[in-house]
């Protein structure tokens, strides 16, 4: 009888273990919260602060379309300030390009290069982390979220597997119950902390609760902060031609 009970208990434990999601599955679920599964556009507003005072701002329109393999291709159109209106950035596969209509030239960019404040070029492109990083579960712990509330989280350690990944490694904290992204720390190849980000202000956008703000704090100077706001989500068709470098001079938003 004891052996039967032990066998039954062992089966229960094995079943629970097999049902637990892997770190990679939790990362993919977190991606599904940050990003819609279909082609879409949204407005991205960047605001840079130094010691609590606004020093710069920029408004962009992002067009993102999922590609075979699950990653996104993104076209970014500069809207404000007026001096930058009409400029474009394109991320497709392992290439990123900047196009200036003034001189009608496109130049290759690094995703790691700063766009404004603490936001890099790669930060404004729509990216599924699960396609560029391998995840391992590092800890389960309670942290303070972007609303200064305690949150029980799984800490995932992400290591880059794609050559075009914006960061060498990332520590990502996701809500232990919902897989919502809560906090991230981004590291360079040298393991130097580049920035810390908090995902907050969850709202329903395109059928799911998604973070509509990301607060990015410099890794060396906590007084240097960039706020990214995401709004005006819209599901829409995005022609594949828009996502080709040769088409950039002919791009006209509809």
Where are these regions (language model features)?
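Positively charged n-region of N-terminal signal peptides that target proteins for export
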Residues: 1-4
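Flexible, processing/modification-adjacent segments and terminal tails
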Residues: 20-39, 45, 52-54, 82-84, ...
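Hydrophobic residues embedded in beta-strands of well-ordered beta-sheets
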Residues: 69-74, 96, 106, 181
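Extended lipid/amphipathic-ligand handling interfaces
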Residues: 30, 60-66, 199-204
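N-terminal, post-signal-peptide region of Sec/Tat-exported proteins
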Residues: 42-75, 79-81
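Bacterial N-terminal signal peptides
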Residues: 6-15
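Gly/Pro-enriched, hydrophobic low-complexity segments
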Residues: 105-109, 121, 149-245
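Buried hydrophobic packing residues in well-ordered domains
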Residues: 30, 42, 76-77, 104, ...
């Amino acid at each position: 009888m004891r052996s039967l009970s032990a066998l039954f208990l062992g089966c229960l434990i094995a079943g629970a273990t097999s049902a637990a999601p892997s770190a990679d599955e939790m990362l993919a679920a977190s991606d599904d919260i940050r990003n819609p599964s279909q082609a879409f556009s949204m407005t991205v507003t960047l605001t840079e602060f130094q010691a609590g005072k606004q020093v710069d701002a920029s408004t962009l329109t992002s067009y993102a379309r999922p590609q075979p393999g699950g990653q996104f291709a993104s076209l970014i159109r500069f809207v404000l300030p007026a001096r930058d209106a009409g400029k474009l950035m394109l991320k497709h596969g392992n290439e990123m390009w900047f196009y200036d209509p003034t001189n009608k030239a496109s130049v290759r960019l690094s995703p790691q290069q700063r766009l404004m404040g603490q936001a890099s070029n790669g930060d404004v492109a729509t990216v599924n982390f699960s396609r560029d990083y391998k995840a391992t579960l590092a800890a389960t712990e309670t942290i303070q979220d972007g609303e200064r509330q305690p949150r029980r989280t799984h800490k995932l350690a992400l290591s880059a597997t794609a050559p075009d990944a914006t960061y060498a490694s990332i520590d990502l904290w996701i809500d232990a119950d919902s897989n919502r992204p809560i906090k991230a720390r981004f590291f360079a190849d040298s393991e130097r902390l580049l920035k810390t980000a908090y995902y907050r202000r969850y709202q329903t956008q395109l059928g799911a609760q998604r973070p509509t703000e990301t607060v990015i704090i410099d890794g060396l100077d906590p007084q240097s902060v960039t706020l990214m706001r995401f709004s005006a989500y819209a599901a829409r068709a995005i022609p594949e031609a828009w996502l080709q470098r040769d088409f950039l001079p002919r791009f006209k938003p509809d």
